[in-house]
A protein has these predicted regions:
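A Rossmann-like FAD-binding core segment of flavoenzymes
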Residues: 107, 119-122, 126-134, 201-302, ...
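N-terminal Rossmann-like dinucleotide/flavin-binding domain of flavoprotein oxidoreductases
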Residues: 2-28, 67-70, 74-139, 218-244, ...
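Glycine-rich FAD pyrophosphate-binding loop
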Residues: 49-66, 203-214
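FAD-site-proximal beta/loop scaffold in flavoenzymes
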Residues: 162-178, 264-340, 428
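Flexible, glycine-rich terminal cap/loop adjacent to redox cofactors
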Residues: 4, 35-40, 49-61, 73, ...
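Glycine-rich dinucleotide-binding loop and its adjacent helix/turn
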Residues: 12-20, 72, 149-204, 208, ...
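Rossmann-like dinucleotide-binding cores of NAD(P)H-dependent redox enzymes
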Residues: 21, 99-106, 173-174, 179-183, ...
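Core beta-strand elements of the Rossmann-like FAD/NAD(P) dinucleotide-binding domain
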Residues: 28-30, 136-144, 261-269, 307
Length: 484
């Protein structure tokens, strides 16, 4: 089938899952067998191989996992394309995402990992005992095993939803024709980002969310900023709206009827963005004595060991913090703990997250909702980017930053940033938190002028001013009077 960008798809497939590939024959015991070639698995495998160990990597679909194939890369390519072009064309936008994906594919390819010393096996993995895993019928002897199988979109038990064959992140980027209209179930990060993309492509978009606001896990001000932006882009928001059923249209026309709060919304396509479930059900974990939660997440300790101490796990199959950068950090711990003494812990990682709408929303640590629910006293320091000289000079110079500190202290508990570069601006706060540096430490740094990064120095100044109590002021006054 020919469509714009189809040659890029062929290139990507040939690199990530070559059809004529023949699995190697195991030669002795592996130091590490990694199951799953997404971010956690790729980094674990190439990191271990780079240290000289003997490594096998098993992948049942395509190298690169969700991030490259059906997640971060294609979604950000579409967001960038539709933001840059005033009247973006659907075919050209999707051809661009395919070109971007094909350009990154060599980095995650079977060939690259083979050249790095990793034995790549394409096929289904499963345990046949507590100490042995197979790819197909082939056992792979291993000293240690790392499960990095990721997660996939959940299809909740809404009547008629599964039968409607809805789009998910695994299929939406394969579209070759523009939908006439789109109902998106779930206004988390994925739902909001894709709503913005398709609205920019002149698709009629309906976004449904059970909570009273989009991005319900963010602070209210951030949610409201994104909600307003989505409305301005043409998205129809259905908030506090529990979808009751999805059915074929009554009038016989192609498409779907989404029932919500007693009303019917007609759309040509439905997309589900209502959470994710781990890819663990085919691994035969019980035979290996590996415990899971009710949701199927693999239970690990702070060193990523499972209940089978020979087996470790990392990435989306273990955690509700399902971000590529989190998987990256866990994978680095996997390399240390499986090859050497298990000294690397992941229980105190500082994990930011970002929604790449316009404006972007980035957060790290705890926010006021978490702190108040836990009964923690805190101070909030806030600064609006429009008050910066750079912000005044920019057309999109609005947005704000909030930093939450321990009451009466500069210890940072969390932060929220809203603005067109929030994902970049959250980084120095993560650096401070990771190194246990307080907000006042930012006041000692020099920031280029005029930049939006100056917000952090302004927040540090605000904290330092808070220490100028009446008692301190009286001492200063006395000293200045004495030295006059």
């Amino acid at each position: 089938m020919s469509y714009p960008g189809h040659l890029f798809d062929a290139t990507t497939a040939a690199l990530l899952s070559p059809p004529d590939y023949i699995n190697p024959t195991p030669q002795g015991r592996y130091h590490l067998v990694v199951v799953g070639a997404g971010p956690a698995g790729l980094i674990s495998a190439i990191g271990a191989a780079g240290l000289g160990s003997k490594v096998a990597l098993i992948e049942r679909h395509r190298m690169g996992g969700d991030c490259l194939n059906v997640g971060c890369v294609p979604s950000k390519a579409l967001l960038e394309y539709t933001s840059y072009h005033k009247n973006p064309d659907f075919d050209e936008a999707f051809a661009w995402l395919r070109e971007v994906r094909a350009g990154i594919a060599p980095h995650d390819s079977v060939a690259r990992y083979g050249e790095a010393g990793v034995d790549v096996y394409l096929g289904d993995a499963s345990f046949n005992s507590a100490g042995e895993i197979c790819v197909g019928d082939q056992p792979l002897p291993a000293r240690r095993i790392a499960i990095c199988t990721g997660a996939r979109a959940a299809i909740p038990p809404i009547p008629g939803l599964r039968e409607s064959n809805p789009l998910t992140n695994e299929s939406v980027f394969d579209l070759t024709e523009k939908p006439a209209s789109l109902a998106i179930l779930g206004a988390g990060a994925i739902g909001c980002e894709l709503a913005l993309v398709f609205a920019r492509l002149n698709v009629e978009v309906h976004l449904f969310e059970l909570a009273p606001r989009v991005l319900p896990l963010e602070v209210t001000a951030a949610s409201e900023a994104v909600g307003e932006a989505l409305r301005s882009a043409g998205v129809t928001l259905h908030l506090g709206a529990g979808v009751e059923s999805v059915a074929a249209r009554d009038d016989g026309a192609p498409g779907h009827s989404v029932s919500v709060n007693g009303k019917q919304v007609l759309t040509s396509h439905v997309l589900v963005a209502l959470g994710r479930i781990p890819n663990t059900e085919t691994l035969n974990l019980q035979s290996a004595g590996i415990d899971t939660t009710e949701r199927g997440l693999i239970v690990t300790d702070k060193k990523l060991r499972t209940s089978n101490k020979k087996v470790y796990a990392a990435g989306d199959c273990t955690s509700t913090l399902q971000f590529t950068h989190h998987a990256d950090a866990q994978a680095r711990a996997i390399v240390q703990n499986t090859l050497f003494a298990p000294t690397a812990s992941v229980d105190k990682l500082v994990v930011p997250h970002c929604t790449y709408t316009k404006p972007e929303v980035a957060s790290v640590g705890q926010n006021p909702d978490h702190l108040e629910a836990a009964g923690v006293d805190y101070d909030c320091y806030e600064f609006n980017f429009a008050e910066l000289d750079r912000g005044r000079a920019e057309i999109n110079g609005d947005g704000f930053a909030q930093v939450y500190t321990e009451k009466g202290s500069d210890k940072i508990l969390g932060a929220t940033i809203v603005g067109h570069d929030a994902g970049e601006q959250i980084a120095p706060i993560c650096l401070l938190m990771s190194n246990r540096l307080g907000l006042s430490a930012a006041g000692k740094a020099l920031f280029s002028y005029p930049t939006r990064s100056e917000y952090l120095k302004r927040l540090a100044d605000a904290y330092n001013r808070s220490r100028f109590t009446p008692r301190v002021a009286a001492i200063f006054k006395a000293w200045l009077g004495f030295t006059a």
